[in-house]
């Protein structure tokens, strides 16, 4: 029998990974986990994890995965959106929750948005996904500079994802990963959700995490993709398509802000995205 007591879960989830989770939220989570997994173990059915998007809050996924691991619970399938695609993809590759936690604590997050690199120091494969400049300004037909497509240029983000997923670079079918995996993104031109089940894991994850206005849309095979959370932030449907009988959905996206917390560009962008995500979750 599982023994997922409220206090036990709160003690085991690392504070540095948990960020702004409130104790009330964790109490609800612990109760749901007890009920869900008690039924699931008795039934012996296939289990899938659905990891939502949620920006910085998304790293709370790692804390939840760590507790589940310690209870001997492992998924048969994983699907992720945005930051959930990053965590889910790496977990599907075989990284443990502890390894993911250590990785996140060591990573220099500020460097991901400071695109100061020397192109001559990059491998050929890395150059393929890295723009030539650190600040990109496009010109229109009249040779007039246009505003950039995003606040940040994602050179270093692309390179970091390239490094993290390098060991899976030869795997073209995500069902062949240690844990079968799917992630989703949104087609910028049609607004339709797109599911990635094969190809480059790095590209699939990068497409899913293209937060509008913060990172430029990711171009792949003539299509431009933005954050998967815009079309479906909780990829439960993907897991049912993979064959999961039971699904644990881990939702970590931000709640809507009040007026006192919508004061700058980033906060307004975050609020705008979360309005769409909140509406999307209600529809699904």
Question: Residue locations for each model-derived region?
Answer:
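N-terminal secretory signal peptides that target proteins for export/translocation
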Residues: 1-26
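Patatin-like phospholipase
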Residues: 2, 43-81, 89-284
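N-terminal processing/targeting junctions
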Residues: 8-10, 39-42, 74
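General helical structural elements
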Residues: 12, 31-32, 61
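Enrichment for repetitive, rod-forming helical segments
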Residues: 19, 34-35, 64
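Extreme N-terminus of proteins, especially the signal/transit-peptide cleavage junction
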Residues: 24-25, 40-45
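Sec-dependent N-terminal signal peptides
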Residues: 29-39
């Amino acid at each position: 029998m599982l023994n997922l007591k409220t206090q036990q879960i709160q003690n085991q989830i690392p504070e540095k990974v948990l960020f702004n989770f409130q104790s009330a939220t964790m109490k609800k989570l612990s109760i749901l986990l007890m009920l869900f997994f008690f039924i699931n173990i008795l039934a012996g059915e296939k289990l899938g994890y659905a990891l939502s998007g949620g920006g910085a809050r998304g790293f709370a996924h790692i804390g939840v995965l760590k507790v589940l691991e310690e209870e001997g619970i492992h998924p048969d399938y994983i699907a992720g959106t945005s930051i959930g695609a990053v965590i889910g993809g790496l977990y599907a590759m075989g990284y443990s929750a502890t390894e993911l936690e250590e990785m996140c604590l060591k990573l220099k997050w500020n460097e991901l948005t400071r695109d100061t690199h020397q192109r001559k120091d990059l491998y050929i494969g890395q150059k393929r996904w890295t723009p030539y400049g650190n600040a990109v300004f496009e010109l229109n037909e009249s040779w007039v500079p246009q505003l950039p497509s995003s606040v940040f240029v994602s050179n270093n983000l692309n390179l970091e994802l390239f490094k993290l997923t390098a060991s899976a670079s030869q795997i073209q079918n995500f069902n062949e990963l240690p844990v079968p995996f799917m992630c989703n993104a949104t087609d910028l031109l049609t607004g339709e959700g797109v599911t990635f089940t094969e190809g480059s894991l790095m590209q699939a994850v990068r497409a899913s995490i293209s937060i509008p206005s913060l990172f430029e849309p990711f171009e792949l095979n003539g299509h431009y993709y933005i954050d998967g959370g815009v079309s479906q932030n909780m990829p439960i449907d993907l897991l049912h398509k993979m064959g999961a009988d039971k699904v644990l959905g881990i939702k970590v996206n931000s709640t809507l802000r009040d007026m006192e917390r919508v004061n700058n560009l980033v906060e307004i962008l975050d609020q705008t995205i979360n309005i769409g995500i909140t509406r999307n979750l209600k529809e699904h």
